[in-house]
């Protein structure tokens, strides 16, 4: 009777059990060395000693997918946003030099649809496999009246580890370091409030539209391209000492994120035009009548991650990145910052 009254109030406990049943296989597929236990416990367990680190430092990160979820829900395509939430978290800990160990997800919804939410979690599991992290726990909160029945929100949390002497700090990059840009898959998971305003409020663009600028792809397909996860291509370079700094290009674009990887004594000189800008950005710029500053300060503009590498190691780093499947561009370098200069990034045409 208690369960029935709870269901009458909008929370279906049995739907929660069904969701757990549906995702068990996906969760199990993410197991890695160090994972302890099984799904369903009160807490996720991980054995750090099993990894053989000498002086391990734990690095944590948390993030969400933002209003990209609105696009996914309108398109009824929910199987890739899980990759996005993992990417947003693990790429951040990678920027500190850390290997992601495990991940936990949090889903809040107005109505627990086990089939729909299972597809979300399957995306999370896929992201975890791309990152080499175990999905060791999570929470699904059914909150009627807080969310509409067809709405959900998605966030995540990751913990990584690095040897203390391999951590990347703002003091590691040096003047003369070369900046290597790694191609993004598109908009990734930032700037979607501006995207939605441009396309759906200022203009009557349909997600199914296929403008010529997108070369056969629909607007929705282009926007939902999952955020690229750079762990397996970049982490080996960090462990080999080939990388001085990493910038994950998220909210704030190149302007805000590149300076986060070096100290105030340096500036980054980036040559605009030295990499391929995906069609979606040119389309958004045109439709939204955006200035260059709007674009640089909001979007990744085709670079999901930027690495600072020693000049004498750049070719070795490039070849390793190319071999791992990355598109790599030499986009600039670090130089000494003159006294009083406030501009960290100089965009050179």
UniProtKB/Swiss-Prot annotation:
Keywords attached to this entry: ATP-binding, Cytoplasm, Ligase, Nucleotide-binding, Purine biosynthesis
One Pfam family recorded for the sequence: AIRS
PANTHER family hit by this protein: TRIFUNCTIONAL PURINE BIOSYNTHETIC PROTEIN ADENOSINE-3, TRIFUNCTIONAL PURINE BIOSYNTHETIC PROTEIN ADENOSINE-3-RELATED
GO biological process: 'de novo' IMP biosynthetic process; adenine biosynthetic process
A GO term for molecular function: phosphoribosylformylglycinamidine cyclo-ligase activity
GO cellular component terms, A-Z: cytosol
Record-listed E.C. numbers: 6.3.3.1
Protein name: Phosphoribosylformylglycinamidine cyclo-ligase
Organism: Lactobacillus delbrueckii subsp. bulgaricus (strain ATCC BAA-365 / Lb-18)
Reaction catalysed by this enzyme: 2-formamido-N(1)-(5-O-phospho-beta-D-ribosyl)acetamidine + ATP = 5-amino-1-(5-phospho-beta-D-ribosyl)imidazole + ADP + phosphate + H(+)
Pathway recorded for this protein: Purine metabolism; IMP biosynthesis via de novo pathway; 5-amino-1-(5-phospho-D-ribosyl)imidazole from N(2)-formyl-N(1)-(5-phospho-D-ribosyl)glycinamide: step 2/2
Family in the record: Belongs to the AIR synthase family.
Cellular location(s): Cytoplasm
Top-level taxon of the source organism: Bacteria
InterPro entries named in the record: PurM-like_C_dom, PurM-like_C_sf, PurM-like_N, PurM-like_N_sf, PurM_cligase
Coiled coil: none
